[in-house]
């Protein structure tokens, strides 16, 4: 799994464990993708949105995905929508869709961030931030992962009061540094060296 999938699954499971009713809307083509029927069942909290291209970097939704998303949100009537932003054109439509059905929208902005790099990767990251900033400013809240990231988004027009920093964006009780040193740890460390 990529980080987005792990993040989505762990967030969903944690909310379910706390007694919240969760619906999961994600990109996944059903076997009969040419069908014009809705991609959900009446009582099913999970919805599959059709796509044309899907990778770990971006997703191109099918032409009917936006309609499916709107119908799903109207049917599910959520109290709140959380979007794990996946570099998809639908990310930019979410603020308007949620506003139309009067549902608060929170997003987690996953694109990588490195304030120090000055290379092609950093330029691509900067372009992604510039493209997303106007849309992120329309979300009710945006989850990000660091203070430097917050500063960049604020400079690009995303109000600081809409940004919430969750370091690493993970459950720190599960994902934490290994602290118990033992013989196997020392063997691995000796093989890899102290810089790793």
Where are these regions (language model features)?
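A short helix->loop->beta-strand "cap" motif at the edges of active sites that frequently abuts
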Residues: 101-105, 139, 160-162
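A short, charged, and often flexible helix/loop element on the N-terminal side
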Residues: 36-71, 83, 124
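N-terminal subdomain of nucleotide-sugar transferases
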Residues: 1-31, 101-103
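A short beta-strand/loop micro-motif in the catalytic core of glycosyltransferases
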Residues: 138-146, 164
């Amino acid at each position: 799994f990529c980080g987005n999938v792990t993040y989505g699954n762990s967030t969903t499971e944690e909310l379910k464990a706390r007694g919240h009713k969760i619906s999961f809307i994600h990109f996944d083509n059903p076997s009969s993708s040419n069908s014009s029927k809705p991609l959900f069942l009446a009582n099913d909290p999970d919805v599959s949105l059709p796509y044309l291209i899907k990778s770990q970097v971006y997703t191109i939704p099918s032409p009917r995905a936006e309609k499916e998303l709107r119908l799903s949100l109207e049917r599910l009537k959520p109290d709140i929508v959380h979007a794990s932003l996946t570099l998809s054109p639908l990310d930019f439509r979410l603020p308007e869709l949620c506003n139309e059905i009067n549902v608060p929208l929170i997003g987690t902005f996953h694109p990588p961030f490195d304030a120090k790099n000055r290379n092609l990767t950093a330029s691509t990251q900067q372009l992604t931030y510039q493209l997303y900033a106007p849309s992120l400013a329309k979300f009710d809240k945006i989850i990000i992962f660091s203070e430097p990231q917050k500063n960049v988004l604020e400079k690009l027009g995303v109000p600081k009061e809409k940004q919430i920093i969750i370091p690493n964006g993970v459950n720190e009780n599960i994902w934490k540094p290994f602290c118990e040193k033992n013989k196997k740890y020392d063997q691995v460390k000796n093989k890899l060296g102290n810089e790793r």
